[in-house]
Amino acid sequence: MNTARNARTARVAYSGAIHSATPLDGGSTARLRLADGRSVAEADVVWLPPFAVGSIIALGLNYADHVKELAKELTVGSQDEPLVFLKGPNSLIGHQGATRRPAGVAFMHYECELAVVIGRSAKGVQAADAMAHVAGYTVCNDYAVRDHLENWYRPNLRVKNRDGGTVLGPWLVDAAAVPDPHALQLRTWVNGKLIQQGSTAHMVHRIPALIEYLSSFMTLQAGDVVLTGTPEGVVNVDEGDEVVTEIDGIGRLVNHIVGDAVFGR
């Protein structure tokens, strides 16, 4: 994976093909420059996840304040070891995409997360060397349907593997452009109201430790992505809501909540 030429890149569908794209105006998504030199408007493209995604590895309960928030509902145990789980490829969508709220659901919430993108193979990597395996970062909004959550340590597939429930983008930001990924502010707005606010400084298990842990029992490949968890401040979202998740220096990710009727079933 090579992001060296541009600190900020995207992938979009335009005119029947998939293109790499960069912003024409700083970090704005309003107009894009395609790899072939054409300039296009955001309204004319479909945003995809900003890189070819391999394995999707997600963290649960990786912010202490979020643990306290959820412990009011369920028993949460020790965090000596990261709580990790895998997500399916059909859960992925890009910036400005639509996420379905299933009929009859009582509680579905967003999760603003820093997504760490692996740039080269990692197996048996020590924490001190782990950051050399990171290509870059993007924003993730990792939805959860809490109705089906019975045990945080055995996440039900219906909670975290819904089609279109893992929103990535808009940009892949080169690791060299992010001096300290543990000093970033995360924010979420629902219909223009700021609801969630936190900092990556409060991760329980930091990125080098996560890469060391994961690579101790599995090989991480270029394109794999590690979703590092969310801080406190999650609330229910409903059909018609606009959800915006933002991480300083990484991007501002827009997503829309829709009902079953939009999908024809």
PLM region spans:
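Short catalytic-site patches enriched in acidic/histidine residues
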Residues: 83-101, 123, 164-171, 232-235
